[in-house]
Amino acid sequence: MERRLVKQEVKRLLGEYIGIRLRENEFDPKGRGQLTFLDDMVNQVTLAHYDLAISVASQWLDCSENLTWLQWEKVRAPLHVRPAYPNRKEREAMILSSYAGVLMNSIPIEEVLKIYGANSSASPDSTKVAQALLPRRSLHPFAMLTAPRAAECNRRQSVKLRRGATNKNTTSSSTKKATGQNGDPVGKGTHTPATNISPTPVLSSAQPFHSSTVMWRNLESAQRQMGLEGK
């Protein structure tokens, strides 16, 4: 009995390890990967699941129609039927939408707001943070969202962007000092009448990169919560 349980546990652990390694190998930040014969076979099988999910979701969203047609005998679709969403981007958009729903149900709403670049309005020190424009990571959404290397890639990118912002701020401050020393009219003592209008707040250029740091941290925490991170 114990040997059988140990064998099942080892088999499960090997399956999880191999699955994580496959997802890591599929992680393609530059989108240069080529589809193999195995990928084509997997796509053939998953297209049926895509079509079934899309058809059920479309009927569920349309409240005007009767949902009595949702029976197993009627929703079964043959594999040779042309998919309703043959476009790769549309299929990946549906995958990302489904995965986003899973993440939003598994993490607090405050963390979700941080991912989208804004803190919760309920907190007193909430400040709006501009979103970071990060490049597209991969053409394989599942590989990106489940591979542990995706979070590390995001972290390195955020560090690189933060360094660029620091260098930009240093260059800007040195330019302002040089302008003031070379005869700026304001620096010579020109009087500016005081007004009650407060200056327009300027967002720090480092704020967008704080959003990117929060994104990869939340991605790592979501992976740990859902058991998708490699052991």
Curated annotation (Swiss-Prot):
Which segments carry the region annotation Disordered?
153-206
Superkingdom field: Eukaryota
Compositionally biased intervals (Low complexity): 166-179
Q: Name one Pfam family in it.
A: DUF5563
Q: Polar residues bias: where? A: 192-206
By its UniProt entry, which InterPro entries does this protein fall under?
A: C2orf80 (IPR038776)
Signal peptide stretch: none
PANTHER family noted in UniProt: CHROMOSOME 2 OPEN READING FRAME 80, GAMMA-CRYSTALLIN A
Q: What is this protein called?
A: Uncharacterized protein C2orf80 homolog
